[in-house]
Regions:
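Structural motif
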Residues: 6-11, 63-69, 106-113
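Serine-hydrolase catalytic core recognition
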Residues: 79, 88-184
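Short beta-strand segments and strand-loop junctions that repeat across beta-rich extracellular domains
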Residues: 70-71, 166
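Short polar/acidic secondary-structure junctions
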Residues: 2-4, 59-61, 103, 163-165
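Multi-bladed beta-propeller domains
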Residues: 2, 14-50, 58-61, 71-88, ...
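Residue position within the beta-strands of beta-propeller blades
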Residues: 1, 54-57, 98-101
Length: 184
């Protein structure tokens, strides 16, 4: 997809090479965290030959929120995991069900069994004990921020002290990730 428009999109072609449809066109107006202005497909889970549905994960204007989608043969796309955070899926071979994994900056992974419409059938692992243990440390919560330079916007996250006072002075620990997918 990158060759067509510069972004990682999906396109469905017939066997003659004719473009049939753009898959999962999620473009929407609104504020874009970190300057990401387009949908970026991050993973393709598969194609259901019986229904013509394509299942995939994508970032839609916000690189901190990955969601799982299904694009139908008629071109309509539905979000199967609408909760903000990082969502992934492992689909059954018949695409009737999937195991959803969701987490965000302040919550460990939650694993759920869902149907192919995104309805949660049961929670498999909620990691409540880990969340409660972390809460017992009485720490502040993590939050994203955008750091802007004249040329770029970078996304970071910070943990402020529990009783943060905006006028106070605090020590800072800074770490920059420079590996694959980094913004450096």
């Amino acid at each position: 997809g990158r060759e067509r428009n510069g972004y990682n999109h999906l396109y469905l072609y017939n066997l003659n090479g004719q473009l049939m449809q753009t898959v999962g066109d999620l473009e929407k107006p609104g504020q874009r965290l970190g300057g990401v202005a387009h949908t970026v497909v991050t993973e393709v889970y598969g194609y259901d030959e019986l229904t013509g549905d394509i299942y995939f994960a994508a970032l839609n204007g916000d690189p901190t929120n990955q969601k799982v989608y299904v694009s139908h043969k008629n071109g309509k796309t539905d979000c199967l995991t609408p909760k903000d955070g990082w969502n992934t899926a492992i689909f059954a071979t018949d695409f009737k069900n999937f195991v959803s994994t969701w987490s965000d900056l302040n919550h460990p992974a939650v694993y759920s069994l869902c149907n192919n419409q995104g309805k949660t059938l049961t929670t498999l692992i909620d990691n409540k004990a880990l969340l409660d243990k972390y809460a017992s440390y009485d720490m502040g919560t993590k939050e994203f921020f955008v750091f802007t330079t004249p040329d770029e916007k970078f996304i970071g996250w910070m943990v402020k002290p529990k009783d943060f006072n905006r006028g106070g002075k605090y020590p800072v620990i800074m770490y920059q990730y420079g590996g694959p997918g980094s913004q450096q």
